[in-house]
Amino acid sequence: MPPRPQRLAPVADLPPVFAGIDEAGRGCLAGPVVAAAVILPQEYTLPGLTDSKKLTAARRESLAEGIRSCAVTWGLGVVWPRDIDRINILQATFRAMARAVRVLRQPPPALLIDGDKTLPPHVLTTLSCDGHLPTQRAIIGGDGCIPAISAASILAKTFRDRLMDTLDRRYHGYGFAKHKGYGTAEHLAAIAAHGPCAQHRLTFRGVRPNPAAEEQLTLW
């Protein structure tokens, strides 16, 4: 059985070294899902560090620069819509998280993941280092109470937002720079007017050409 998620993790209960992990874009209709992994040093100065959703875009960018500068190591993982449609959004999110961990300069002995799910065995085994697997724990609301997870949420969000700005210049008429791929009324109207583009998740409600087709819902 996977470890039970915790709503709060007292500092004394945290492993001495761990990577905080979070994602951005899981619930979007377009664009990739992006995950970040961050190992913070024992001492750092990042005033205002918290869940990325509680910050302005300008504050996120400022903190992201500080996180990249002070982190022991950090990494990003990206999974694009074609693979999201092929393996589903839950598995794509796991894959993005594993990719973020694999590019860290040092393998973490432990993973603290925002949410209520840990990496499944078939994904966790890809992170083996010299035969050792990291321990892992899911923490509900971790992006608001564990600084390394907060840092990961900020890096994932800022990187993905920049990707969506780039995609907006390539795929005109959808407003990606404004809504970042989320299912706003403006975005849904653009899909209805122009049809989906290569960056849309065709298995998601609101995008799929045939409303009677099998629906993929966000599993988290």
Swiss-Prot record:
Catalytic activity: Endonucleolytic cleavage to 5'-phosphomonoester
Cofactors, names only: Mn(2+); Mg(2+)
Alphabetical list of InterPro entries matching this protein: RNase_HII, RNase_HII/HIII, RNase_HII/HIII_dom, RNaseH-like_sf, RNaseH_sf
Free-text comment on the cofactor: Manganese or magnesium. Binds 1 divalent metal ion per monomer in the absence of substrate. May bind a second metal ion after substrate binding.
Subcellular location: Cytoplasm
Xref: Pfam families: RNase_HII
One term of GO molecular function: RNA binding
Positions that bind a divalent metal cation: D22, E23, D114
PROSITE patterns given in the database record: RNASE_H_2
Keywords recorded for this protein, A-Z: Cytoplasm, Endonuclease, Hydrolase, Manganese, Metal-binding, Nuclease
Entry GO CC: cytoplasm; ribonuclease H2 complex
Family statement: Belongs to the RNase HII family.
Its biological purpose: Endonuclease that specifically degrades the RNA of RNA-DNA hybrids.
PANTHER family: RIBONUCLEASE H2 SUBUNIT A, RIBONUCLEASE HII
HAMAP family, A to Z: RNase_HII_B
Name under which the protein is recorded: Ribonuclease HII
Organism: Nitratidesulfovibrio vulgaris (strain DP4)
